[in-house]
Amino acid sequence: MRILIPFIPLLTSISYAAEKNIIFIVTDDQSPTLGCYGDPVAISPAVDSLAQDGTLFKRAYATTASCSASRSVILSGLHNHFNGQFGHQHAYHKFASFHNVVALSLPRVLSNAGYRTGQIGKYHLAPEEVYRFDTYLKGNARNAKQMASVAKNFITADDEKPFFLYFATSDPHRGGGDDASYPGGHKPNFFGNLPNKAAYEGVDEVFFDPNKIPVPPFLPDTPESRSELAHYYQSCARIDQGIAELIKILKESDLYDKTLIVFTSDHGMAFAGAKTTVFEAGLHVPFIVRNPYEKKRGIESYAMISHADITPSLVDFAQALDREKNQPKNFVKADAYWKNKDYVAKDNRGHRPYTSYHGDSWIPILGKKNASHHETMFASHTFHEITMYYPMRTVWDGKYKLIWNIASGLPYPFASDLWASSTWQAQLEKGDDALYGYMSVGSYIDRPAFELYNVTENRYEEVNLASNPEYSKILESMKAKLKAFQKATNDPWISKWEYE
């Protein structure tokens, strides 16, 4: 007995630590088109099973509908106008987060907390030293099932440390060219699907009838929209098979009930009217959390959460968050980290200090159907590519939503793949008065300075109340909230209130 007693605390510690694993799944340009969100045609049994066994958030939002900028918010807990990732990371004319974000970066903080960290799939943000993982796994980001198989050895490694796996698909992002098999002059994009109805290795591809696809109200109900949506749904169904494989690996390894699983997307689907906008269709994302330690399951929550909440939540789950200060417990100041690292230019380190997260942990509200989180939400978009400058700032309080189009007067810029899409081009060639969903082509391109919507009555933002004198007090109140947010988060574009 005297031999065993000293080892009991050690064994308990190892067992507990090894249980607090995290898998964070982020898809690429996916709206809540899932069975668990009521979509009538989606094939998503694996994701649906996570919802049945966890908490599904009905009001979860990205803070920007652009890939790199959104991913920087996900992995820093900071709005992109503050972390420096103003737009896309790729190409020579790229953006990158400020180096001082290293103090709050999710993979860095979890590594400091004793996690082994791994990444597979799409990365698409910079600098790597700020968002560094211990292990980078190589997999086909268009084949989530193969990605899961590649990640198996990392997940099941014989290691007393808990793991954090960042699992990022490239589906259902546009890509792979256009499908020439469709009739007409405008061909749908493949959305990563293979030509001639071929299948990725190990995947049972699911094909959708364009005539049976539900067309969301922000899109025109045209053959072009339907054919592209059919490819989009196929790409989403492929993701689900990868998640099923992940779940299988976890269960076979006795890790399913020791692993937090989060499923979301960087922002809404890759169609004009959604991606790169701050409209509902651009920011509303699927968000499901399965916490194995939460007894209440199958919960649908109407609490408002955002991508800025992700990093503090996962750090909180790892018991590494100082909730009072909203910062890591073992906080490593950025200046201390970069000391003696002269290769990092001091003029690119960003704001001082980076000491706390903009978002808040949702761990305490998991399993609580009637819990609230944020009363007011904010979104911030500035660039997509560097040539696609159109800063927008947004605030909504559950009833009213204000959009400030800072560059109003300039034509609204398009992501190149959205501009080239058959869905958009088919309407564009009909002229400015042609309807694109609930907007005209012309009104989509030429935006007013302010847009005010009652989102409880007008979810998809058809009726702009900003110029209605009956709503002048509400407009000014929302402007004040937006200014306060910009001031609190050191938004450089706050100066535009005064100078433009």
Name each region found by the language model.
Residues 24-27, 31-121, 125-138:
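Active-site segment of extracytoplasmic enzymes that catalyze sulfate/phosphate-ester chemistry
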Residues 18-23, 53-58, 112-118, 159-165, ...:
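Loop/turn elements at helix/coil->beta-strand transitions in domains of secreted/extracellular proteins
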Residues 29-42, 142, 155-161, 166-311, ...:
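Active-site-proximal cap/lid insertion segments
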